[in-house]
């Protein structure tokens, strides 16, 4: 509703972060809108150069195989890092020696969950069966023997792939940046490059990271329940807010049942509030990280129905706390095993797959994320960082038009450009959400600018546009397109005191503003 006070300010319940888009990570040189055939070969190799290397872990192309696997490691154990395996009973063993690991930093205690990234020194690792690792080690030994005569006994590692025929890669689709698998099958369009980070990355220089092409971040808030938050979560959140980097949150689960996940959910809500993160601050979801965890005296669930209850309880806690934008994160083999449940699939929006293609195809939403490498390199970050591509499978025909409000001048601004809206919000403008939806093609709506008072105006009438230009307004081209026959009327209001125009679908707002002095100028156009 438009407030009578000053006849200018439009009431808003949205914050800056109400401008919502689905976005996602790549090396800086790959974060360019480039054609598929022009994708740098080195980037294709970054994604997949080690996938077929003779000394790489299955499903983890950047993790090195052990030289040998102890006979004490059973085939049904799970390898959780380059040097650790977990038995079905939950005991952690050294892969090469078979000795049981008791370091509380790695396995926790009966009452204390360990940092899940401690086992891998902060890097992501997709758990794989010990049987597969044994097969890979055996194959690696055979390849080394076959190649040793021509390589003077040196350790052999296959060269990087030449071009992008073999690796997942960035390109363009429908004139938007997109991410493809190694066969050029589209994973997502309108795609963004996103990193996920934790305290293991230390103090990140977020300004450098943003300048290097980072378009979003998923920040670890914590793990389990009753633990401290991630030591760098507050700093990472503050920096993303300061620099206008869209961000989301992830929380690693140690839940054995719905009771545990409910506690985890309550912990997430508590820490989000503690760190000043409102639902409107989150451009990406709060992700529930479900993996095969290791915790002394405890074992992760294996029944999908149990996990379904875990997910529902966590969702309930977050939703009760006011956080609705949620998602599940996991890796393909776990989704095809303990998480194989239709309800969980419907909530899965981010998947780790360190290979040439995404093998999980049951995304329940149009938006999706592919964490495609754990060894990305970004300026401002020491060491490796996970990279993901976030986007949508199908391109929406609806173009959101963002409404911004300047509290100092009392003027409103409308734009189809999300980056422009974000830039204005960083300069102090209030984001009043999406005013209406335009179309991708149709009748042009022209945008003109008054350099004397900073006012913008938007009109479908080319004669009105030309007349204003003749008076000194600047022609800024086409702002967006609208259909001949749309779903709803968009009304035009004029403030005779400020010269401001407001465009709204809300008939109640239109009539209310008219009752307090705004000029009701009828239907401007229809929304898509």
Protein language model features and the residues they cover:
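Sec-dependent signal peptide cleavage junction
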Residues: 21-38, 44
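Substrate-binding cleft of extracellular glycoside hydrolase catalytic domains
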Residues: 179-311, 321
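Catalytic domains of cell-wall/extracellular-matrix polysaccharide-remodeling enzymes
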Residues: 279-361
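Trp/Gly-enriched beta-strand/coil motifs that build multi-repeat beta-propeller-like domains
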Residues: 397-528
């Amino acid at each position: 509703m438009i407030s009578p006070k000053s006849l200018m300010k439009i009431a808003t319940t949205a914050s800056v972060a109400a401008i919502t888009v689905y976005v996602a990570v790549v090396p800086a040189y790959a974060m360019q809108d480039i054609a598929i055939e022009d994708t740098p070969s080195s980037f294709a190799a970054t994604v997949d150069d080690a996938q077929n290397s003779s000394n790489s872990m299955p499903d983890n192309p950047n993790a090195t195989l052990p030289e040998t696997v102890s006979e004490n490691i059973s085939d049904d154990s799970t390898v959780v890092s380059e040097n650790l395996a977990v038995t079905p009973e939950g005991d952690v063993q050294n892969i090469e020696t078979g000795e049981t690991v008791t370091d509380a930093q790695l396995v926790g205690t009966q009452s204390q969950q360990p940092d899940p990234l401690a086992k891998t020194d902060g890097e992501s690792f997709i758990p794989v069966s010990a049987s597969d690792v044994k097969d890979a080690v055996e194959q690696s030994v055979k390849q080394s023997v076959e190649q040793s005569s021509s390589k003077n006994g040196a350790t052999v590692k296959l060269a990087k792939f030449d071009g992008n025929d073999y690796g997942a890669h960035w390109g363009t689709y429908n004139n938007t940046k997109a991410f493809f698998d190694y066969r050029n099958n589209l994973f997502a369009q309108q795609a963004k490059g996103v990193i996920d980070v934790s305290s293991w990355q230390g103090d990140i220089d977020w300004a450098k990271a943003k300048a290097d092409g980072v378009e979003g971040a998923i920040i670890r808030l914590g793990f389990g329940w009753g633990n401290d938050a991630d030591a760098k979560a507050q700093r990472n959140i503050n920096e993303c807010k300061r620099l206008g980097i869209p961000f989301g949150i992830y929380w690693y689960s140690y839940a054995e049942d719905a009771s545990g996940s409910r506690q985890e959910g309550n912990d997430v809500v508590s820490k989000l509030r503690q760190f000043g993160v409102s639902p409107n601050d989150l451009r990406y979801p709060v992700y529930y990280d479900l993996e095969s965890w290791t915790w002394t005296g405890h074992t992760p669930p294996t029944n999908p129905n149990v996990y379904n209850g875990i997910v529902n309880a966590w969702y309930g806690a977050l939703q009760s706390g006011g956080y609705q934008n949620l998602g599940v994160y996991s890796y393909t083999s776990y989704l095809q095993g303990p998480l194989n449940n239709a309800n969980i699939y419907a909530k899965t929006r981010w998947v780790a797959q360190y290979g040439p293609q995404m093998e999980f195809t049951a995304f329940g939403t149009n938006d999706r994320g592919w964490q495609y490498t754990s060894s990305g390199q970004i300026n401002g970050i020491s060491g490796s960082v996970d990279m993901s591509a976030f986007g949508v499978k199908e391109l929406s025909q609806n173009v959101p038009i963002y409404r911004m409000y300047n509290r100092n001048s009392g003027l409103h601004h409308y734009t189809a450009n999300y980056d422009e809206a974000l830039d204005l919000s960083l300069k102090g403008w209030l984001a009043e959400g999406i005013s209406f939806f335009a179309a991708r093609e149709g009748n042009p709506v022209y945008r003109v600018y008054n350099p004397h008072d900073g006012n913008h105006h938007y009109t479908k009438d080319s004669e009105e546009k030309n007349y204003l230009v003749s008076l000194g307004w600047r022609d800024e081209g086409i702002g967006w397109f609208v259909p001949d026959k749309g779903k709803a009327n968009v009304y035009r209001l004029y403030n005779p005191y400020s010269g401001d125009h407001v465009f709204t679908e809300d008939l109640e707002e239109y009539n209310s503003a008219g009752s307090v002095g705004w000029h009701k100028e009828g239907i401007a156009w229809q929304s898509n």
